[in-house]
Amino acid sequence: MSVTQYYGTGRRKTSTARVFIKAGSGVITVNDRPLDEYFGRPVARMVVRQPLELVDLVEKFDVNVTVSGGGSFGQAGAIRHGLTRALMEYDENLRSELRKAGYVTRDSREVERKKVGLRKARKRPQYSKR
């Protein structure tokens, strides 16, 4: 007996998350650890739960996530994006609601590369007139 599960890939900065959701009681597991243990900051945990809370499906699905790369907030954003895609695979009618909240769009902001002759991406060395 196979349980129907839905999949979504999410990305944010350098993080990539593979999100699997299946009918359950609302348990969220990230890299084989509970959500509260994996993310220390409450804000990161809140970001992950946002799509489920928006569509009132928090207690309906068990979420299993594999995430790699980036920092904690990048990973949280990637999980949110993947979870949104998985929910849309489950029910396409949720798309408009999730789109309105801004969860469907991939946040394309990436770190700007460092340029030759500059200290960082845009910071120039101090200018000396004389």
From Swiss-Prot:
GO cellular component: cytosolic small ribosomal subunit
Family from the record: Belongs to the universal ribosomal protein uS9 family.
Record's protein name: Small ribosomal subunit protein uS9
Organism (species): Cellvibrio japonicus (strain Ueda107)
GO molecular function: RNA binding; structural constituent of ribosome
Alphabetical UniProt keywords: Ribonucleoprotein, Ribosomal protein
Tree of life domain: Bacteria
Record's keyword annotation contains Lipid metabolism: no
Bias (Basic residues): 116-130
HAMAP family: Ribosomal_uS9_B
Keyword Ribonucleoprotein: yes
Any one Gene Ontology BP term: translation
Pfam families: Ribosomal_S9 (PF00380)
Region (Disordered): 108-130
